[in-house]
Amino acid sequence: MKKTEFYTVRDKTTQFTTYDDMAEIVAYLESKGNFHDGTVEAIGHDEESTTIGFKHYSDPEYTIHRLIFTGNVELRLNVDLLVRSIYEIQCETGERVNVFFNGVGIEITASHVILRVQELITQEKSPPS
C-alpha cells in the first residue's frame, strides 16, 4: 500500500494551544509522557480541528504522526496495545463511534462521526508460521 502522507517534523517551535473540550485528553497524555511506545510531540487546535502528534520509537526517522479530529471530540485510549498503523480521522456531525488502529481501540464520544478515514502508514503483516 502506498503511503499517502509521510513527513518528519524538525521544527520544535510550532505553537499549539488547547481548548476546554480537549483538556482531559491533554492532561492524560501529558501524565503518561509515553504514547503507545512513542512520545507525544504536540497537541494542537485551530478553528477547524484538533491534532495529536506523536513519534513512534519503531520509526527510524522518528516521523511525527497525526491524529486529526474535527469538532468536539473526547478520546479514551487503550494504552495496553501498540499502535503500528496510524490513521487520519475527520469527524463531522453524528454519533459515538469506535475506531481501531490494528486492534488498538480509540473510542470517540462526541456529536461527531467519522467523515473520512485515510490510512497514513500501514504495518506489513507477517505471514502465518
Model-identified regions with their sequence ranges:
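Surface-exposed, interaction-prone regions used to assemble/regulate multi-protein complexes
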Residues: 1-129
